[in-house]
Design a protein with these regions (language model features):
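Proteostasis/folding factors centered on peptidyl-prolyl cis-trans isomerases
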Residues: 119-150, 154, 192-207
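Hydrophobic membrane-targeting alpha-helices
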Residues: 17-22, 90, 147, 151
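Acidic/polar surface patches and capping/hinge elements
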Residues: 150-176
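N-terminal targeting/tethering segments
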Residues: 25-127
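Short linear loop/turn motifs
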Residues: 103-108, 138-139, 174-181
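Short, low-structural-confidence N-terminal segments
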Residues: 1-69, 166-207
Length: 207
């Protein structure tokens, strides 16, 4: 199997330890989360949700199934935003960057190995609830995670991830769920956090 064929959005990365925790306080009006002192607004989160719903609605006969499969889309998209911010902080601390060429090379590899750009985007929508306009962020994360793994070693990102979480001092609006330290997933409750995504499989031939 090629390394990009099974699309892994998330990073076994951070999140293999119940040691990671997040702050949860009183919800600030219009704020989904605060990361490193920067607000993630509910309007920005809703814009991402709307983009995904619009893409799902363009999926023809598959639209209803795609929508039904993402009942907690707000939580899922906030989770994705938080993961990306942590990856950015890890990369910043490590002195690593993702150039536009890096991102385009990553895109080409995924597109080539998944039967073309349309199939690649359809796979991300189906398995990762990502709209076409969100693909670049996915690719950037993949580039940075590859570089982080090269620097620290495969399976050794827990410590830099924990340091990034501490540095960012994340606060999350309780309406979006709770971080379950044992299950390492975002669930219903008071303390939302980052969830590990299911690894999407390659689309069937001819899909």
């Amino acid at each position: 199997m090629h390394r990009r064929t099974a699309l892994s959005v998330s990073t076994a990365l951070l999140l293999a330890a119940p040691l990671l925790s997040a702050c949860s306080g009183e919800a600030r009006p219009g704020t989904a989360a605060v990361v490193g002192g920067e607000r993630i607004t509910t309007s920005a989160l809703q814009a991402q949700v709307n983009d995904v719903r619009a893409a799902q609605n363009r999926a023809g006969q598959a639209a209803a199934e795609l929508i039904a499969s993402t009942p907690n889309l707000e939580r899922q998209k906030l989770d994705s935003i938080l993961q990306s911010r942590i990856i950015d902080e890890m990369a910043r601390t490590a002195g690593l960057t993702a150039t536009q060429k890096d991102i385009e090379d990553e895109r080409k590899a995924y597109v080539d190995e998944n039967g073309g750009a349309e199939q690649f985007e359809a796979l991300l929508l189906q398995k990762g609830a990502m709209a076409p306009g969100q693909v670049d962020r996915f690719l950037r994360d993949r580039v940075l995670l590859t570089k982080l793994s090269a620097k620290y070693g495969n399976g050794k990102l827990e410590e830099p991830a924990r340091a990034a979480v501490q540095a960012l001092d994340i606060e999350v609006n309780p309406r979006y769920g709770a971080w379950d330290a044992k299950q390492i997933k975002l669930g219903v409750g008071e303390t939302p956090w980052i969830t590990q995504r299911t690894r999407p499989e390659q689309a069937p031939a001819g899909a």
